[in-house]
From Swiss-Prot:
Pathway: Lipid metabolism; butanoate metabolism. It is an enzyme of class 3 (hydrolase). Participates in the degradation of poly-3-hydroxybutyrate (PHB). It works downstream of poly(3-hydroxybutyrate) depolymerase, hydrolyzing D(-)-3-hydroxybutyrate oligomers of various length (3HB-oligomers) into 3HB-monomers. It catalyses: (3R)-hydroxybutanoate dimer + H2O = 2 (R)-3-hydroxybutanoate + H(+). It comes from the Bacteria. This is D-(-)-3-hydroxybutyrate oligomer hydrolase. Its main location: secreted. Residues 1-24 form the signal peptide. One of its GO terms (cellular component) is extracellular space. GO terms for biological process: butyrate metabolic process. InterPro entries: OHBut_olig_hydro_put (IPR016582). Its EC number is 3.1.1.22.
């Protein structure tokens, strides 16, 4: 679609002429004005519409305001065992907003970004509450098993003369409010925001009680929910009842256990959210014909649409732009996207004119590599001052197991950990990510992601316990236990869709010494060593190249989630933190830039912005000691990317070229959460004409990033 500064006099004249021609040719009975009815997309089910006044409740902060979002006091439900839908919504917005951005004043919240900072970057005295309406519905393929949540927010400030919309597909494996902090940009601009949980979600199917979540997060029994369940697990070889009798207290999560490999459809679901958004906008603002039928007054050609989000949501936005055959998307602005290139893309990535050690690998490839090596690498002497560093006997034991399996070398723990860190470098992690390995290890990040994606790609049932893993709440003895009713009742709001989350942990069901046991403290059966389940990590890794039925199923799933690289000439900005330790730039945004040039050539309008001293989890900046000293918020650069793409689409202003942005860490005492206040000088703008030393060069099949 093309937008000429919202001036469409020529289009209007053409439309008028077309209407006259239709009448002259006897086209249609328009005597009642019902010429273009606003038909709800066929995939959309029952729609719930809720208005929010912008005072007691609102679209962005659920009535909490800027101060409420920043408060450490969560808006817990009045009756924790039976929260209302409204309470769960408020709690979900609070939790998910704080999971994406740093909400500390020292980190820039309230001064450089946040609800009280307006669309022009001015700090206001208000709380940033935004009145408007929400449209909520499932998208389904007719089976009642897909039930992807769709949500559209339309602020009361929506400008019908300059209509706009952005997408905010959920990040990670989160629920529909997972990217509410991204939606903030659109709401402030008076744009509609189209959200989707993309077939993932935070609330589990509790197999003990056989209860499941509904679309609003409230829970009921599986039989009572029927096809209205947001997610209900299906059995594998065993029935769910037989499985639970043998293996009690387990939980099934939609991303891991839906048996649908939802990632293959993240682009489709994002496009469906846009279509739902267009319908909702016209349901609200379309003219009504004399026969009472609402019309599609604001056609998609009149609405500026930017696909946006972060992490998995950012990858979904890129996928949607690639798959957009109907002109739904005008531009793309994403941060730290999960991008999987085809193994044969053969993109050469260079840093400082020197080829990097590895690039363009699939997420499942590098996350299973991290799952083997990262725990040991976190013990490296070079990382003793890194955030969350601590000597860990389980990780030290992992080092020895890696040596025994000839994956690293060394006779001392120091040498072994250094070897593991070197192996991560050889696998494509940049040295700037080194300081992140201890904290990512602490949260068992690589294991939880590897297990989730292995199950998803292989379309495994929860009853399959792929590689001997399951999900369950644990108590002080680290063994599976019944999840507390109050915790389960609020997991729609508090969970992130993968363990560890809300007391739920990853379980090693093959620990012969303890029985089922929390993964990070468990014993490998192959060596009777408490090495945080090396056996499970190796099993997950072997699925990538194995030949048995489970490995073949996983490899088939992986083949379905790869990008094409063709954005069809859409203006696009990708921002990514150079230090990202979860989705390393060498495997994601850097090679995608080259892949896009390979596919589009001179037609490409993609720019890539690499931000120094930025990493994947902005929320950790104010929460984990040591992050605030080292890292700046990438979220601020997503805001700037959205500004740039919007300006390009509405005024024709050129997008900034690909570049490295040289930020300045806040500094201060090492490993505190109270670094000096983030100032504008710490986070310089994206340059319209970067110095030569900061320019990223891209050509067909090649990318060169300066040091």
């Amino acid at each position: 679609m093309h937008h000429d500064n919202f001036r469409r006099l020529g289009n209007a004249a053409f439309a008028a002429a077309a209407a006259l021609l239709a009448v002259a040719c006897g086209g249609g009975d328009s005597s009642d004005g019902n010429t273009n009815p606003n038909i709800k997309p066929a995939n959309i089910g029952t729609v719930t519409i809720q208005a929010y006044d912008g005072a007691t409740d609102d679209l962005l902060t659920a009535g909490l305001g800027k101060d409420g979002l920043a408060s450490a006091t969560a808006p817990v439900p009045a009756s924790p065992n039976s929260p209302t839908a409204a309470e769960l919504r408020r709690y979900a917005i609070y939790t998910n907003y704080r999971a994406i951005v740093d909400t500390t004043a020292g980190g820039g919240f309230g001064s450089l970004y946040g609800p009280n900072v307006d669309a022009q970057g001015n700090v206001t005295t208000g709380q940033g509450k935004i009145a408007g309406v929400e449209y909520l519905a499932f998208s389904d393929d007719g089976s009642g098993q897909e039930n992807v949540t769709m949500l559209v927010q339309i602020p009361n400030t929506f400008n019908q003369s300059k209509p706009c919309m952005i997408t905010a597909t959920s990040s990670g494996s989160r629920g529909v409010y997972g990217a509410i902090a991204v939606g903030e940009w659109g709401l402030k601009r008076g744009c509609a925001v189209a959200y989707t949980d993309k077939g993932t979600g935070a609330a589990p199917h509790d197999l003990d009680t056989d209860t499941v979540p509904l679309i609003d997060g409230t829970r009921t029994t599986r039989s009572a929910a029927g096809t209205n369940a947001q997610f209900a697990a299906r059995p594998g070889i065993l029935s769910l009842a037989d499985f639970t009798a043998q293996v009690p207290h387990r939980l099934a999560f939609k991303h891991a256990h839906s048996q649908r490999n939802p990632e293959k459809d993240w682009g489709k679901f994002t496009l469906q959210a846009i279509e739902f958004g267009i319908w909702a906008i016209n349901d609200r603002f379309g003219t009504v014909a004399s026969n009472g039928v609402r019309q599609r007054t604001l056609a998609k050609s009149k609405i500026v649409v930017i696909a946006s989000s972060v992490s998995n949501g950012g990858g979904a936005a890129v996928a949607a732009a690639e798959q957009d055959t109907d002109g739904l998307i005008d531009g793309v602005a994403v941060a730290e996207p999960n991008l999987n290139l085809p193994p044969n893309a053969s993109i050469l990535v260079k840093r400082g004119s020197k080829p990097v050690n590895a690039s363009g690998r699939l997420l499942y490839d590098y996350i299973t590599t991290a799952n083997l090596l990262q725990l040991c690498a976190s013990q490296a002497t070079a990382l003793v001052n890194a955030p969350a560093f601590a000597t860990n006997q389980f990780y030290i034991s992992r080092c020895q197991t890696l040596v025994d399996n000839k994956l690293i070398s060394g006779t001392t723990v120091s040498d072994q950990a250094a070897s593991a860190l070197d192996q991560l470098h050889l696998a494509g992690w940049e040295p700037e990510s080194d300081a992140l390995h201890p904290s990512l290890s602490l949260f068992d990040t690589a294991a939880s992601i590897a297990v989730t994606y292995a199950n998803s790609y292989a379309r495994a049932s929860v009853t399959d316990r792929l590689c001997g893993y399951s999900f369950a709440a644990t108590l002080a003895d680290f063994k599976p236990a019944a999840i507390a009713p109050s915790v389960l009742a609020s997991m729609f709001a508090t969970g992130n869709g993968v363990p560890p989350t809300s007391t739920v942990q990853l379980i090693n069901d093959r620990d012969l010494q303890h029985g089922p046991f929390m993964n990070g403290q468990s014993v490998s059966a192959s060596n009777n060593r408490a090495d945080a389940n090396f056996d499970g990590a190796k099993c997950l890794r072997d699925l990538l190249t194995g030949t048995d039925s489970q490995a073949q199923a996983l490899q088939s799933g992986v083949s379905q989630i790869q990008r094409s690289g063709n954005l069809h000439g859409k203006p696009a900005l990708i921002v990514h933190g150079r230090s990202d330790g979860l989705l390393p730039v060498n495997h994601t945004s850097r090679p995608y830039l080259g892949f896009n040039r390979q596919q589009e050539g001179a037609a490409s309008k993609l720019s890539y912005i690499e931000v120094e001293n930025a990493q994947h989890f902005d929320a950790f900046i104010g929460a984990v000691s040591g992050y605030s000293n080292r890292y700046v918020p990438l979220h601020l650069y997503l805001i700037r990317a959205l500004d740039a793409v919007y300006d390009n689409l509405t005024t024709g202003k050129a997008l900034p070229p690909s570049q490295v942005v040289r930020t300045i860490p806040r500094g201060g005492a090492t490993n505190t959460t109270t670094a000096p206040t983030l100032l504008p000088v710490n986070v310089p703008p994206i340059s319209a004409s970067p110095d030569a030393a900061n320019q990223i060069a891209a050509s067909t099949g090649s990318v060169d990033v300066p040091d």
